[in-house]
């Protein structure tokens, strides 16, 4: 292997190409810095006035220092990229591509423009990643325990996506097969989610419209909210938290059940279009509330309330608890209606 330290190019580039492992401690170039090796380890501080590019056929290890480019910063590894107590900074874009990428709690990635992280296997983030424009993270398994911030768009895409940290963008898109959120997923504008199964005890929210598509199960004990309209489409919904769309709420599902302490609310209109509905807790709308179901049941402690009109259409309606409307209430049960409220 090649072990180098304190490399300086005051009037040009630094180019390093090793057939074996390459280890460099401290480098400075007014131009570009390029490092290639069978494996690459960088310690200390590395600064490029131009692009900074590191590529390895195996692993890249970054520890206890900084990588700083006035232009683009690019890391490409055939194996793993490891970031330990390391700060990456780019005047333009940052790109990380590897089979596995890990970032510890003491590390940061900052770019004036875009940040793209692509892991063909696992991506684990525990530190802070901040993009002046767009942030994109994709992996087969993405475990996000840190802070991801984008001043423009943030997009996460993974087969398995686990978030216990904070993700925030001016707009936010989430794509996965299974998604678990015990942290926060926030958008300053619209939020779009497309997944099979979504489990959350944290907070998912947007100032703009929220569109959620869960082809399997959605289970929430946390907050799922929009200051604008919220549209939720799922196979099965278990709602034991807060589900709210300030300017409208629409839920379409095969089954919907809400728990005793749940709040399902819109300041505007609400439509529940569900085959089988079992409601407890609070279900309320400032405007018209419509429930369209094959089978509807409300528990003794359930509150079904509308600031204007309440419309219930079902084949089988079994109503307990409170049903109330400020204006008109219409209950249409084509086969069976029981009321014990």
Task: Please provide the spans of the model-predicted regions.
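Extracellular beta-strand scaffolds
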Residues: 1-4, 8-15, 20-24, 28-34, ...
């Amino acid at each position: 292997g090649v072990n180098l330290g304190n490399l300086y190019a005051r009037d040009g580039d630094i180019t390093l190409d090793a057939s074996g492992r390459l280890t460099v401690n401290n480098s400075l170039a007014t131009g570009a810095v390029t490092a290639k090796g069978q494996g690459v380890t960088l310690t200390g501080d590395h600064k490029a006035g131009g692009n900074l590019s590191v590529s390895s056929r195996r692993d890249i290890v970054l520890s206890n220092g900084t990588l700083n480019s006035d232009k683009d910063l690019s890391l490409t590894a055939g194996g793993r990229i490891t970031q330990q107590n390391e700060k990456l900074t780019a005047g333009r874009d940052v790109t990380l591509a590897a089979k596995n990428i890990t970032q510890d709690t003491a590390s940061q990635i900052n770019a004036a423009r875009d940040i793209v992280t692509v892991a063909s296997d696992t991506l684990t983030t525990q530190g802070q990643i901040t993009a002046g424009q767009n942030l994109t993270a994709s992996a087969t398994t993405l475990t996000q325990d840190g802070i991801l911030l984008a001043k423009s768009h943030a997009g996460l895409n993974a087969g398995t996506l686990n978030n216990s940290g904070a993700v925030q963008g001016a707009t936010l898109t989430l794509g996965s097969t299974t998604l678990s959120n015990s942290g926060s997923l926030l958008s300053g504008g619209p939020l779009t989610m497309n997944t099979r199964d979504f489990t959350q005890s944290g907070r998912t929210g947007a100032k703009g419209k929220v569109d959620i598509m869960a082809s399997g199960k959605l289970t929430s004990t946390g907050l799922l909210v929009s200051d604008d309209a919220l549209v939720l489409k799922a196979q099965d919904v278990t709602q034991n938290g807060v589900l709210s769309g300030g300017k409208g709420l629409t839920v379409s599902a095969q089954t919907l059940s809400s728990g005793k302490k749940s709040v399902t609310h819109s300041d505007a209109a609400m439509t529940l279009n569900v085959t089988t509905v079992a409601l407890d807790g609070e279900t309320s709308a400032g405007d018209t509330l419509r429930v369209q179901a094959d089978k509807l049941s409300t528990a003794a402690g359930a509150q079904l309330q509308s600031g204007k009109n309440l419309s219930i259409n079902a084949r089988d309606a079994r109503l307990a608890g409170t049903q109330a409307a400020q204006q008109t209430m219409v209950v249409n049960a084509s086969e069976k209606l029981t009321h014990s409220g």
